[in-house]
Amino acid sequence: MSSYLDRIGAGFIISNPEALDFDFVPNEIVGREAVQSELANKFASIDRHESSCRAIITGPVGSGKTVLAKTFCRDLQRHLANKREIMIAHVNCRNASTSTRVVQRILHEIDPGHPDRGLSMGELLLSLRKLTRKNSSHLIVVLDEVDHMLRKSGDDLLYQLLRIDEDQQGKGTLSLILITSIIVFLIINVF
């Protein structure tokens, strides 16, 4: 028959095929130490309970922005394991391009049983406030490809997320990482 099919089941050509998966996160990123240090500097105060941090990661498609954010968040959770519980909500805004869908995905990340339907944006944000305050943990929201959401829904959600602790006397419950391949300042009105 066909000899080229003899390779099927004969063994792997690639020793670690998981490394080619879309969601694969390596143990370490090689050659990106300066960028990792810069991101760590932006989050230097996150070990204090009253602190929230913000960062924008930009770069061309395929430059490693998403894997940088994922490794940073994973490493930060490990680093602060005995000091502060860190929860991560990573939302791809290309797949969830409206503000409502983004907040639903954030809520589902921190509470898988949260209802997906029947709540207004105000009710969703109230649920997010309650969930972040109920736990003594800190939530890092990563909005990947945020420019898609900004074009479709505007910047109101960013404003709401940045102001989520406004009545908490400085208690930081939410930090924000925005990832984009374009300069977001051209899209958002105020940041």
Task: Indicate where each model-derived feature is located.
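Localized chelating/binding microdomains
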Residues: 14, 37, 62
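Pre-Walker A adenine-sensing motif
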Residues: 37-48
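Mid-core helix/loop region of P-loop NTP-binding domains shared across ATPases and GTPases
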Residues: 1-16, 21, 49-52, 69, ...
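Flexible, nucleotide-binding loop/lid elements of kinase catalytic cores
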Residues: 27, 53, 89
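Dynamic helix-loop-helix/coil hinge segments at AAA+ ATPase domain boundaries and subdomain interfaces
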Residues: 18-37
